[in-house]
């Protein structure tokens, strides 16, 4: 089961005001072999990109996949 994370920081200057932002994310997933050649994948990703002014930017992503190996 893969699990990961990431942290990003950014700084902007707007006029005489400095803006600092930090974001982070987490991912996780699992694969299940239903036959020797076919795997079902299920994954989730969360990102929090921080706040800009009074708005918070977050994303949630779920994924489902089928892999075929030859």
From Swiss-Prot:
Originating species: Haemophilus influenzae (strain ATCC 51907 / DSM 11121 / KW20 / Rd)
GO MF annotation, one: porin activity
Pfam families according to UniProt: Opacity
Leader sequence residues: none
Family: Belongs to the opacity porin family.
Name of the protein in question: Uncharacterized protein HI_0414
GO cellular component labels: cell outer membrane
